[in-house]
Amino acid sequence: MHNHPLRRATVLAVSWIAGQAGHATADYLVQRDCDAQKKQERTPEGRRALASHAISYGITQAATRAIAYRAAGLRVPARAQITAAVVETIAHTAIDDGRALARFADTTGKDGFHDLAGHGINGRALMDQASHTGLQIPAGSMITAALSD
């Protein structure tokens, strides 16, 4: 479809940059306060809050990337964009659920940092954001680039 040697690298770079922007927008500007407060509760209300945030996150992330591809003059197939959006939304939901991150912290001996919540530092929030920006966004960007050829 597109064989230019720099195309995949360009798609990867634009996707990654837009992914960072979409993440910040979705997590800090779009996410409703009530969802942020309830999404880790193991109740029907908590599950609805997590689902609500996941949906708004996925839509915001996908829209941000689509706008960036358009601005960069890139034609990225819908299949690549949709697959990456689904993978990132699922990953984001799993991270924001909190249980996997708590298990990771416990298994790796980082539970003290995970539970740190004083002096202006929140270890769990920092680990959450590191998971999003260090794992989830790169995964979505690499999937997009791989499927864009």
Predicted regions and their residues:
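Short amphipathic, positively biased membrane-proximal segments
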Residues: 1-149
